[in-house]
Amino acid sequence: ADAPGDDYVISAPEGMKAKPKGDKPGALQKTVPFPHTKHATVECVQCHHTLEADGGAVKKCTTSGCHDSLEFRDKANAKDIKLVENAFHTQCIDCHKALKKDKKPTGPTACGKCHTTN
């Protein structure tokens, strides 16, 4: 399958819940522009971990049985990989931090540096 171009944007899936701010409803973060070609040196299966098992088909991260929990992250589920938020944050931020530690070029790790578009 053809990879998306550099205009690809990662956004919260429909139905995603925002974390409340005290007794007020919260808001979802801004979307994340994803420059796919900058990640072309990474093996596809590093991010698309079911690629081989699915016969080369790229499925959405929120496919049933994968990262399909749309709850907001809190202390009780902070490590639950079923949460789509945790899946992206673990994959992206951990990789960027590892590259930074190895003094290699990398992407951002701060919220506002990734979540930049509406």
Curated annotation (Swiss-Prot):
Record keyword Transport present: yes
Compartments, record wording: Periplasm
Record keywords, A-Z: Electron transport, Heme, Iron, Metal-binding, Periplasm, Sulfate respiration, Transport
UniProt-annotated binding residues for heme c 1: 36, 44, 47-48
Residues where heme c 4 binds: 89, 111, 114-115
One GO biological process term: anaerobic respiration
Pfam families, per database record: Cytochrom_CIII
InterPro entries per UniProt: Cyt_c_III, Cyt_c_III_dom, Multihaem_cyt_sf
Maturation and modification: Binds 4 heme c groups per subunit.
GO CC annotation, single: periplasmic space
Binding locations of heme c 2: 49, 61, 66-67
A GO molecular function held by the record: heme binding
Assembly notes: Monomer.
Protein name: Cytochrome c3, 13 kDa
